[in-house]
Amino acid sequence: MEMAEIGKAPENGVSRPALSKEDGKARDLLTEWIKPFVDEMMVDEVGNMFFIKQGTKSDLPIVLSGSHLDTQLHGGRFDGVLGVLAVLEVLRTLHENQILLDHGFGLVNWSNEEEARFCPAMGSAVFSGKLSSEQVLDCRASDGSHYGTCLKQIGYAGNQLPSSLKVKAYLELHIEQGPVLENESLDIGVVTGAQGQMTMDVTLQGVAGHAGTVPMRLRADALACASEIISQCRSILLKKEDGVMTVGTMDVEPNSRSTIPSKVVFGMDIRSPHSESLEQLKNQFTEAISSISQKHHCTNNVEIRSFKPPTEFDDSCIEVIESAAKKLQYGYKRMPSGAFHDACMVKEIIPTGMIFTPCLNGVSHHPSEYASQEQLFKGVNTLLHSLSELCRK
């Protein structure tokens, strides 16, 4: 895997953050590989790369597919890069078999999908009109790096306007980044959209006291309160089939072994593929927080930090992918994505679909991220048949 050698990290990991020297080398290698199979290459103002193979009918819009080459720090070899190299393989197959399609066909490498350096999905956000080129080019990373300057340094500051392309549909192949397909012994995930997400911060205020002198029944223990709230919210979700919850941050005061916790702040991440379910969960969780706080003699404050509604992909793209999986006799299921992808941006302006392939133990953003050759073949083959169908319709 020559691409994985660029930014190679310990334990088979890859560190190739957006607009780094390693990202530039990966872009160079992709360009070298793909030149024999395309007619045109374009780079837009924020570094999105487009490689176009013309169709037999030049007046028709192109079909686009791709993903991203940048990675998390000490991330894996398959996240993003699979979707790019899969399209390279599709283009190679069409070229070697002299297959001509009515619609033109293009590969896109979206600039800066990961959140390893800059804010995520900036390239696809500009393409879809969610951000302006100026906003992205002026962005600074946590280390102070300037997006526009870094883009010039690696040689990928283009001048094509994102709106200059006419696109019929967009498909993206990606590892699932979760354990569902592997757990159900399936080959392909036909992605229906992405889960909505709500984040909230919960603050619980109790009363500090001596760990040895205050009886249990007289305590206002903020940490005990938080523990019961989290357990109750988990129980609520376990009765459902369409949501997940994670408590990933927690601050405890005074954080002393011999002092009853007086204050706890914890962050919740709640996701569901259905807007009404997210709203219902918010109400159920808020009610649980209130009642359990009273039980523990604590006060509470709930702050909704963000809300992203669920994403729904295009029905016609979903049907094309499902039809391809059926024809190839692959085991598949329709499923939502638990993570955000460039496709979630692109769907705002173009009919969009996604294909998932299983990954070992559902692990991603980690050096142990892995998908077998057989799994990758089935994913790429499904993409090939789906794209071919879209380019003929």
Where is each model-derived feature located?
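N-terminal capping segment at the start of a domain
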Residues: 1-20, 112, 308
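Catalytic-core environment of secreted peptidases
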Residues: 33, 37, 49-79, 87
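Midchain, well-structured core segments that form catalytic/ion-binding scaffolds
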Residues: 112-276
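A short beta-alpha structural unit
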Residues: 18, 246-255, 267-274, 299-318, ...
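Alpha-helical metal-binding/catalytic segments enriched in His/Glu/Asp
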Residues: 65, 74-115, 198-204, 213-236, ...
